[in-house]
Amino acid sequence: EQALLQYVSREAARTAMNLLVKRDYAEAELYRKLRDKGYSEFFAGKGIEYVSAYHYLDDARYARQMIGSRKDTTSRKMMVSRMRQKGLSDEVIQEAMEEADWTDEMGLTRELRRRFSSAEQIESLTDKDRQKLIQSLMRKGYGYSDIQHVIRHLDELEEGTIWN
């Protein structure tokens, strides 16, 4: 019986390692994956313990990587939502967000630069197209007031860094 417990524990740890080889996971996400693969709560926990002991699993690092890879295309609000879906704790999320040098205004300017080659293009939009743009940005999680602020100050942004 002891040998069987050790064997299944090793298999759970091996499965966790194989999953982590492909990509990083949040602890809760990896736990769900192990459970989906048929491991009981006990053995899924053993697999998590093993990879955590060797620092292969680190929620804070995972949160920082998520922010680094998505901050150019996602609002802070949307990022927090995605992190919660991955099972990251509010403490880890808050810490990672505080460390990040990132504002929604920066994300909006990057998004506008990606879509338009100059500020004049945005200013020349019809009211209908401007509303479509605003709605599109709001679906990405940006606030209406932030969007209005960035669009209103495009001339300053043009002189600064966005289109230079």
Identify the meaning behind each predicted range:
Residues 1-164:
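An alpha-helical, amphipathic repeat domain used for nucleic-acid recognition
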